[in-house]
């Protein structure tokens, strides 16, 4: 899980100045996080638009014989925040949803982020190097593979179904409850 990459406690173990041995300054970590979260809201709305478009295409029961641009515009309307550009249609070039193994599953990108952030929030609660949490993650998630339903595994680890709150905080879209 990439979430450790911007944790000061983790970075202090190895991210040091090669000459002085001084650990990476907290203000530099904050700048890295801010850069990572730049336009996070827009990026997320775009990902939702792509997922809506994907699901719309894969919900058609008969061969499509209509206007691709209009179909796409209608599918993505709930997440439209910028003016539509006439003549622009991304679907013909969106190989992820037709040839990339993500047919009707593009939403998986965002869902994976939700799972990772929510799971990591338990490490943040208990300490990012907490051996009990790490063991529970290994035991309940990693060691089970496909032997049980993924949601069952997740709930066994986390104690509840995935929540979006941790991802929203991670992206800087809501203030963290941490002090």
What are these regions (language model features)?
Residues 1-179:
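Cation-handling catalytic/transport regions enriched in His/Asp/Glu
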């Amino acid at each position: 899980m990439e979430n450790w990459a911007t944790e000061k406690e983790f970075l202090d173990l190895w991210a040091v100045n090669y000459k002085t041995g001084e650990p990476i300054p907290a203000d530099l970590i904050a700048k890295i996080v801010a850069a990572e979260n730049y336009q996070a809201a827009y990026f997320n709305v775009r990902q939702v638009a792509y997922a809506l478009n994907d699901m719309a295409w894969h919900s058609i029961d008969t061969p499509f014989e209509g206007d691709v641009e209009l179909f796409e515009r209608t599918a993505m309307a709930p997440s439209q925040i910028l003016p539509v550009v006439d003549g622009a249609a991304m679907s013909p070039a969106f190989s992820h949803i037709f040839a990339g193994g993500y047919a009707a599953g593009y939403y998986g990108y965002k869902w994976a982020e939700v799972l990772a952030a929510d799971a990591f929030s338990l490490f943040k609660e208990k300490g990012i190097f907490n051996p009990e949490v790490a063991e529970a993650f290994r035991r309940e998630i990693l060691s089970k593979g496909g032997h049980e339903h993924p949601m069952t595994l997740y709930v066994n680890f986390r104690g509840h179904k995935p929540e979006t709150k941790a991802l929203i905080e991670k992206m800087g879209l809501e203030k963290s409850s941490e002090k």
